[in-house]
UniProtKB/Swiss-Prot annotation:
Enzyme class of the recorded protein, top EC level: oxidoreductase
Annotated active site: 12
Keywords: Oxidoreductase
Family: Belongs to the MsrA Met sulfoxide reductase family.
Keyword Oxidoreductase carried by entry: yes
Gene: msrA1
GO terms of molecular function: L-methionine:thioredoxin-disulfide S-oxidoreductase activity; peptide-methionine (S)-S-oxide reductase activity
Name of the molecule in the record: Peptide methionine sulfoxide reductase MsrA 1
Record-listed E.C. numbers: 1.8.4.11
Pfam family, one: PMSR
Length: 183
């Protein structure tokens, strides 16, 4: 087994855990904060935007069972990559989408994946997700961990709303793409 780490930010971390955690080869998914200037930030500090942190998930995975490229594919399916100022209902820099890379190999894979998404025509606006060097990852408070199991009704409502929003955004992008090609 060869363990690797990936860190992705994509809005509220509650909706980022389950889609990764249920995959074979995923060893752990932790909700937390990264990219800020305060050690051991709390949720309230991050929410207030005073700490400079972004909500993110840290994924430990067995790269012999699931690849970083597969994780990138999952990540892109969970976010609106055209929105740099948060995701869905969660607005502000603390909810911005970011791919935090651990190595040059991850950086190259993330860049290739981003370019492929741009060329796909799925989205009608530019892909604006930055690829940044991984910084210290601080686990969030325990009540945030595996939230989808702790409050399944609330999680499902948020998750379904997020899925509907993303489906609508993708549809709008495809519709505009098709209209451009028929003129």
């Amino acid at each position: 087994m060869s363990t690797e780490r990936a860190i992705f930010a994509g809005g509220c971390f509650w909706c980022m855990v389950e889609p990764f955690e249920e995959r074979p080869g995923i060893l752990a998914v932790t909700s937390g904060y990264t990219g800020g200037h305060i050690e051991y930030p709390t949720y309230d500090q991050v929410l207030s935007k005073a700490s400079g942190h972004t909500e993110a998930v840290e994924i430990l995975f067995d790269n012999e069972l699931i690849s970083y490229d597969e994780l990138l594919d999952i990540y892109w399916s969970l976010i609106d990559p055209t929105d740099a100022d948060g995701q869905i209902y969660d607005r502000g820099a603390n909810y911005r989408p970011v791919i935090f890379v651990e190595s040059e190999e991850q950086r190259i894979a993330a860049q290739k994946s981003k370019i492929a998404l741009e060329k796909s025509g799925i989205w009608d606006k530019p892909i604006v997700v930055p690829i940044e060097e991984a910084k210290t990852f601080w686990p969030a408070e325990e009540y945030h961990q595996q939230y989808y199991k702790k409050d399944p009704k609330r999680y499902q409502a948020m998750h379904k709303a997020r899925e509907r929003y993303l489906a609508l955004q993708r549809f709008k992008g495809k519709f505009k793409f098709l209209r451009k090609n028929t003129r």
